[in-house]
Amino acid sequence: MDIATGPESLERCFPRGQTDCAKMLDGIKMEEHALRPGPATLGVLLGSDCPHPAVCEGCQRPISDRFLMRVNESSWHEECLQCAACQQALTTSCYFRDRKLYCKQDYQQLFAAKCSGCMEKIAPTEFVMRALECVYHLGCFCCCVCERQLRKGDEFVLKEGQLLCKGDYEKEKDLLSSVSPDESDSVKSEDEDGDMKPAKGQGSQSKGSGDDGKDPRRPKRPRTILTTQQRRAFKASFEVSSKPCRKVRETLAAETGLSVRVVQVWFQNQRAKMKKLARRHQQQQEQQNSQRLGQEVLSSRMEGMMASYTPLAPPQQQIVAMEQSPYGSSDPFQQGLTPPQMPGNDSIFHDIDSDTSLTSLSDCFLGSSDVGSLQARVGNPIDRLYSMQSSYFAS
């Protein structure tokens, strides 16, 4: 927190000795150019005995006139010594800045210091108040909240280019620290107002626990309800700049009929609201990303667990395919022949009806190794068929 010092002259802010910035030159001397009297000799005509001629600072040409102008230890032609802005001849005094000369009126118009409060020019003869790099009129050096003029010895704070006295700064600090982020906006929309209404049966409980140790007798802050037109004007100005200067706030206050303090608090709350929305959006994005990442990790783990368990192979029923016999292609019954009626006491089927016949159904399924032995034991089935036929007709 700074302490205001006494008023000082503007010339102390910009000393004359700084040649690189600007300085006022009070004395413009006119000197007579020294010429050698009498008839000119041959050496003078040839230039061997001529003194070194003065060079004009403006046009950089030698000065051959009888009179020349001396400014800041430099020589000028009389016609070259003029204002760089209005081209008027300079006779008594001038201002020097960036190797150029200016008259008093043009210099004050172009390079005069401006008040940081009203943005108007400050005359060189006025007393000013300084705060860091800012310069103020005596009347403009006041608090932006209570508009009390700050004098020598008063404590103040320069915040965002605005002056605040000690009392208002502490009030604003307490106000910003006491307001929660959810209630930072003094002007709520209709849907937000509906969400802020407490439920029945919770009113007394919220009153008792809402202050968190603060004085319950502390009066509530006045609440300003903005109209649609005022809100539109504020939002349009906020889109241009979220931190308007004092002049813009005063213009908005005059247009909307509100005080400058209300305008300032609205912009502060709006900035806090935008920060809160941006923070909430960022949290939602992070939550969605974490959920998506968790689902991907869970699915990958499930796939890994399923891949670790190999599926059980279905029990393969060992079905023994019956080998195709050599007579499969030449079926004796495919030409419509009816099988002969065999007598029951035929010696050929005696072994089949005996005890050594098939004992179970499983004996019907023969492996490939059993087929050869069966053929060797029984013989060629076609030969057996012919023998059966011949024996039938013989009987």
UniProtKB/Swiss-Prot annotation:
The keyword DNA-binding applies. GO terms for molecular function: DNA-binding transcription activator activity, RNA polymerase II-specific; DNA-binding transcription factor activity, RNA polymerase II-specific; metal ion binding; RNA polymerase II transcription regulatory region sequence-specific DNA binding. It is found in: Nucleus. Residues 219-278 bind DNA. Keywords: Activator, Developmental protein, DNA-binding, Homeobox, LIM domain, Metal-binding, Nucleus, Repeat, Transcription, Transcription regulation, Zinc. GO terms for cellular component: nucleus. Its main location: nucleus. The keyword ATP-binding does not apply. Residues 56-106, 115-168 form the LIM zinc-binding domain. InterPro entries: HD (IPR001356), Homeobox_CS (IPR017970), Homeodomain-like_sf (IPR009057), LIM_Homeobox_TF (IPR050453), Znf_LIM (IPR001781). One of its GO terms (biological process) is cell population proliferation. Residues 176-229 are annotated as: Disordered. Interacts with DHX9. Transcription factor involved in the regulation of podocyte-expressed genes. Essential for the specification of dorsal limb fate at both the zeugopodal and autopodal levels. This is LIM homeobox transcription factor 1-beta. It comes from Mus musculus.
